[in-house]
Amino acid sequence: MVNNLNEHKEIEFGWFLPTAGDGSYVGVASEREPTLEYLIDVAKAAEKAGLGFVLIPTGGPCLDAWVVGSAIMSHTTTLRPLVAVRPGLTTPVLSARMGAALDQLSGGRAMINVVTGSSVQDLEELGDPLAHAHDKRYERASEYLAVMQQAWTQSDGIKASEFVGSEGAETKQNDQQQPFRGKYYQFTRAVTTPLTVQKPHPPFYLGGSSPSAKRVAVEFADTYLMWGEPHDWIREQIEDFEVVRSQYREETGIDRPVRFGLRAQVLVRDTEEEAWAAAWELISKVSPEAIEQAQKAFAKTDATNQRRQNELREQFKDERFVVGPNLWAGLSLVRSGGAILIVGTADQVSERLIEYAELGVSSFILSGYPHLEEAERFGKEALPLFHQKWASRREVRA
């Protein structure tokens, strides 16, 4: 049984930035190109709606997350960019320096999403030698994050006015530091990076449902991300994670706090009937051939969380993909990743989110189609209701 893990935690909400295009339909060509102007509009709408950050995706047709993150942070004041690092595809020290730069220039708003990869095709295109080695990718990620942490926390940093070359940087090293030497990364000296505004460093977000993913998250993540699933499934995921966290605590004596995050879609309308009609409309233009092609692609994944999405879709296909009250898996016919849609009135959507929060979820990354209009609608109608309900329930518990 999962106790309420959010008794003293604030709930954070983020939105998704559609850097591969946007529109009113899923599984067909985008109606809106991911221009700089449009992405800034979505980011500003999310900020105005009361959403604290934006997840900037990576892979395939997505525009580079770091370039987009740099652009949108210069056009917003409080919105935080959650950008992706890809262990093995860039060096950990370079990623740490990029993260420090983004954190400095944004005034301490940088957030880091650790992506080991779920699409074998994408990993092959990127030349990842571990494209077909799921557990080894997480083993590598563990070392990668350790190096990033060392770069951020075990030096005094390199201030812009002090850049005098490698020898000058070396004089700032702590004599007690030891160079990192692991299976995937070896260094002959301790590594350095510019100073970060956030201490000890920008937060890590990491997802994955496999035991290896949970182990890395227990050790390094500030937020462990899960893709949307029925509430009972999420309860089991959290219970499994707590077992891994307990084992890590027994082995190391370290008890790290980790928050739980949920990635899902939302669709809010005035009536439940309107909402369900709008949900089916999202996939109304998809051809049977496109669905078949998507299913074949999803079946090739070695990612446990995508396999769970596939299983959920198949298990509930005779129920028209309704996997729980106001929960719909229909988008997963053609959309990979966190495709579960929370669909209904503002009251119903906020109530389903409350139920996830009562399980221990304290970070929500949401999206809807089109992302601009749905950010505005969610922020105006459902988000205030959530905050009202959550505050009321916390008062009752107090």
Segment roles from a protein language model:
Residues 19-37, 86-93, 131, 198-209, ...:
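Active-site mouth loops of central-metabolism enzymes
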Residues 65-83, 140, 144, 247, ...:
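Alpha-helix-loop-beta-strand connector modules within alpha/beta enzyme cores
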Residues 13, 46, 50, 72, ...:
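Conserved, mostly hydrophobic/aromatic
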Residues 11-15, 54-56, 80-85, 110-114, ...:
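Hydrophobic faces of well-ordered beta-strands that scaffold small-molecule active sites
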Residues 1-78, 135, 161, 167-171, ...:
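N-terminal beta1-alpha1-beta2 module of alpha/beta enzyme domains
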Residues 5-8, 44-48, 70-78, 99, ...:
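Acidic (Asp/Glu)-rich catalytic clusters
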Residues 53-72, 228-233, 366-379:
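Glycine-rich, proline-tolerant flexible connector loops at the mouths of alpha/beta enzymes
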Residues 2-19, 120, 126-127, 133-198, ...:
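An alpha-helical appendage that flanks or caps ligand/catalytic pockets
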